[in-house]
């Protein structure tokens, strides 16, 4: 079996929007982003080495976005749809980079192993390290927990700044036990797994895609974690109960949809952790939080990305 690859020379600013569009609207089999600065700058995490630099000499100055489709998919139609989407994003004032689109085909079995060379251990903190399942790694600290991950085609390994900002927020928030967490838009389940490793006792992972449900269940099993439940739903729709922590690493536009739902699902004294926010979109998030009775306790930044620790306003 072959895969059709659509490659777009673009920018970090739109990679998440393209990922969601490809998976949800075009039924892509998987997506991938390669960004040189993400790999080169990852050393800010305690000078840890994420990848060998020889492995990424072919990465772009900014971002290559790849979407993978069945070889029978209509290549020209997909290219046209991506072109239209790029112009739509440009109309929002976002940087779309060169927006050059190219296509190619690859044997499915070649892809299954070739892409793994780009991903290695992320020694995130004294509490957590992210370890792709094909890597051997011993904890760097006595109490360091390992998150074993099989990212597959559709979801990342935790090297993106937005994931790291969300994990920072979780490390700060999970200080008492027992504690319950809902991970909204879980993707590979990495934040839900991190919450479990940090001591959360009851965890719900939600997403709109079947692929995410499967990936989260498989990654939970890989880590021998049994306290993560998965639910296919849009944001917190159809979710029962309240939680001590709500964590969401998703696009700002989707966070704006989530904010009005949070009060009904957050325990008294609970915290919310947001990531995935481009700094240009922060004012809209701040305004919506204020209008819905929330305040920002902590702002975390990496490059153009912003993470937030949020609680209810005092009444």
From Swiss-Prot:
Keywords in alphabetical order: Cytoplasm, Methyltransferase, S-adenosyl-L-methionine, Transferase
Cellular compartments per GO CC: cytoplasm
Broad EC category: transferase
Residues that, per the record, bind S-adenosyl-L-methionine: 163, 185, 207, 249
EC number: 2.1.1.-
Record InterPro entries: Ribosomal_L11_MeTrfase_PrmA, Ribosomal_PrmA_MeTrfase, SAM-dependent_MTases_sf
Main location (coarse class): cytoplasm
Cross-referenced Pfam families: PrmA
Catalytic activity: L-lysyl-[protein] + 3 S-adenosyl-L-methionine = N(6),N(6),N(6)-trimethyl-L-lysyl-[protein] + 3 S-adenosyl-L-homocysteine + 3 H(+)
GO biological process terms, semicolon-separated: methylation
CDD domains: AdoMet_MTases (cd02440)
GO molecular function: protein-lysine N-methyltransferase activity
Localization in the cell: Cytoplasm
Top-level taxon in the UniProt lineage: Bacteria
SUPFAM superfamilies per UniProt: S-adenosyl-L-methionine-dependent methyltransferases
Function (record text): Methylates ribosomal protein L11.
UniProt similarity note: Belongs to the methyltransferase superfamily. PrmA family.
The name this protein goes by in its record: Ribosomal protein L11 methyltransferase
Source organism: Lactobacillus helveticus (strain DPC 4571)
The encoding gene: prmA
